Curated annotation (Swiss-Prot):
Biased amino acid composition, Pro residues: 317-331, 475-485
Tissue expression per record: Expressed in brain and uterus.
Gene source species: Mus musculus
The name this protein goes by in its record: Dapper homolog 3
Gene, per the UniProt record: Dact3
Function per UniProt: May be involved in regulation of intracellular signaling pathways during development. Specifically thought to play a role in canonical and/or non-canonical Wnt signaling pathways through interaction with DSH (Dishevelled) family proteins.
One GO MF term attached to the UniProt entry: protein kinase C binding
Low complexity: bias regions: 120-138, 344-356, 524-545
Recorded superkingdom: Eukaryota
Coiled coil: 63-87
Amino acid sequence: MIRAFSFPVSPERGRLRGWLEGSLAGLCELHWLRERQEYRVQQALRLAQPGMGGAEAEDEEDAEEDEDAAAARRAAAALEEQLEALPGLIWDLGQQLGDLSLESGGLDQESGRSSGFYEDPSSTGGPDSPPSTFCGDSGFSGSGSYGRLGPSDPRGIYASERPKSLGDASPSAPESVGARVAVPRSFSAPYPTAAAGAETCSSAERRARAGPFLTPSPLHAVALRSPRPSGRVPCGSPDGAASRPLDGYISALLRRRRRRGAGQPRTSPGGADGGARRQNGARPRPPEASPPPGGARPAREPSTERAWAAAWEAEVPPEPAPPAAASPPSSPAEGRLVKAQYIPGAPAASRGLPGRAARRRAPPLTRGRSVEQSPPRERPRAAGRRGRLAEPSGRRGSPRARKAARSQSETSLLGRAHAAPPPKYPTAERDEPRPPRPRRGPAPTPTVQACRRWRSTAEIDAPDGRRPRARVPAPRGPAPSPSAPPRRLLYGCAGSDSECSAVGRPVPLGRRMPSGCAPGGYGESESSASEGESPAFSSASSDSDGSGGLVWPQQLVAAAGASPSGPGGAAGGGTPAGPAKVFVKIKASHALKKKILRFRSGSLKVMTTV
């Protein structure tokens, strides 16, 4: 036996099945009522006829009555045949409802409550008593309508077996009825009261008592407890009564099914293509709108939907169902995201985007890549937005996504960043890259240096009237250290993930040379032109020009007696430096230089891992 209704479904689906059953029973009821009304009209017309001869009229009237009774019996037999075939029809409807693939939300309910064909526990009569009846407020249950309207054998249809159609409707044994009276009934079918079971006469006895037509009509009981949410009584023409019980609910159900996911954030650039949605929108999709884990479900309209759609097609404006609502995208381009730079793990240059497009990501540093593998960055288009310097009020710029990669030895330095004392060589930096400039040239004008990330000490001194000494490529020797102004000094070059490691000449402790001087001026490492020209490194200038290195005072501890070495050591006004300071230029990537500048304490042991 096919165990069709033994799986749990949502209450909505059970209610839909109940309303379909009610509509079918209403159709049969209307046909039956029409036959009864025709019979009554013919009776009234015969009574209103002018009198014929006495015996002749009586004989003719008896013959007409026999004729009418035979016609009524034929109509009742045809109706019973239709009612016999009705369970099989509702079985087919249940199968098509299963093909609708409604979302089963009520998995916690009992497995038997999925359909309206259940035995009424109150009908405990003999084997030919109907399972439930249309009397009083009993409402309409699926099995009750058949037991009331059909022949004398009961038709209790259970959750575990197929409803008996016309071919296999056999009289049930008494123990089969008594054994299954406790099967739970549907949510959709209104429960009959105990008074419903008191009437134990079969439909044959009732037909013998009340003539060929039953009174009161079962349609009256359907109207008393209509399960529709609108609560309208199915009245009016037969067509109207057939379609009205369904137009409110089924149209709303189909609209909700077609419109599912319409309020969710769009994450694909296409319009209403209905492709598989990627869950990266502004807000997460609610779990009931997410597609089922069992795979794609075909969004099709079965014959049930087409059969009942004709009634409400004129009222409800048609909404286009998404054609490919559940098909996954055939290529990555179909399901691509709106913001492609949020795909993790792909560098910005490999996706063909400029470096500034990746600025919205904010991982502090990408780890694990060596400096040689980092591709050259291109920043030609962001020049118009880079006019402001960050306020020199102690704010260190937020970490940017365009930092170069660091090696594993650099990663080991991260843990000590927070334990460092206050900075000794503070920086004035900006949040954004700067436009490309020629490799060598005169000292930058204030407009040019406003667009640069780092400013040298010489450039900081320039507004105060101090003329910086030109750098001469001479062998190292002692040099006096004029006082540095109490401003935030710059101690590294931003754009240079440079690989040049020429050992520079000694430089005063608190100062850096102007960037426009001779080959080896520190400003050249800041130009994007030098970064773009050397493809071997991420943004490196060559070793020959000596630019881009990080100047580090290795005799800082020895200078503690001559110049103040506290946090204000670099800004100690007017204090001349003592013996010669040896400065070493370190080959460092941009990320490493940024990290070194965070470690600006007196301890140089940090640098042993470079």
